[in-house]
């Protein structure tokens, strides 16, 4: 399978057996991103790593021959997923028409319809040639737990959006790249 990332990870399968195996795994671990971190020579025993926007996840061993799965260890058993906030995918247009993707994390109990007049932290990623991804971030969860909405945006130049998007950032530091951040703030308001 080939792996790529949009707002969450996605896979393209080259054979029906791999696809069927992964679909079985996904049904059992719904709501989590799943990575295959190891596999035996016969490719029927897999080591899996899960995570989500609310948890660092766990490791599992999966035997595809008998469809048995066993949890090996929770990565962060002290984190209660029920106390964490959802990381929502968002998209907006920059002032020059470029689509900018990102994430909005709202305090628990809020959604896009009822989140009005919340304090907001605008949290652009470093780099600039990096990106924000869907997954657990303790800093973001801390801020949401304290009542802040947190906006993360993948401004022009962020990786994973193709060559044209990447090159649109050349010689644009402090200019269009900054405008993308400002435009995200205006979109949120």
Show the residue positions of the predicted features.
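A short linear hydrophobic-aromatic micro-motif
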Residues: 32-36
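Gly/lys/ser-thr-rich phosphate-binding loops in alpha/beta enzymes
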Residues: 1
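Serine-hydrolase catalytic core recognition
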Residues: 37-189
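Structural motif
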Residues: 8-22, 55-60
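A short helix->beta-strand "capping" segment at the edge of beta-propeller domains
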Residues: 19-31
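Alpha/beta-hydrolase-fold serine-hydrolase catalytic core, especially in secreted/extracellular enzymes
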Residues: 17, 28, 65-67
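Short loop/turn segments immediately following the C-termini of beta-strands
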Residues: 4-5, 51
């Amino acid at each position: 399978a080939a792996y790529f990332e949009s707002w969450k990870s996605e896979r393209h399968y080259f054979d029906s057996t791999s696809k069927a195996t992964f679909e079985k795994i996904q049904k059992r671990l719904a709501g989590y991103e799943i990575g295959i971190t190891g596999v035996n020579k016969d490719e029927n025993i897999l080591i899996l790593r899960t995570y989500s926007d609310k948890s660092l996840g766990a490791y599992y061993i999966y035997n595809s021959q008998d469809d048995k799965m066993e949890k090996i260890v929770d990565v962060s058993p002290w984190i209660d997923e029920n106390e964490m906030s959802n990381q929502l995918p968002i998209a907006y247009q920059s002032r020059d028409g470029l689509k900018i993707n990102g994430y909005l994390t709202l305090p628990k109990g809020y959604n896009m319809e009822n989140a009005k007049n919340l304090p907001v932290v605008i949290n652009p990623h470093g780099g600039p040639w990096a990106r924000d991804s869907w997954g657990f971030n303790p800093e973001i969860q801390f801020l949401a737990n304290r009542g802040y909405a947190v906006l993360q945006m993948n401004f022009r130049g962020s990786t994973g959006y193709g060559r044209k998007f990447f090159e649109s950032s050349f010689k644009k530091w402090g200019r269009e790249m900054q405008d993308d951040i400002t435009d995200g703030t205006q979109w949120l308001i």
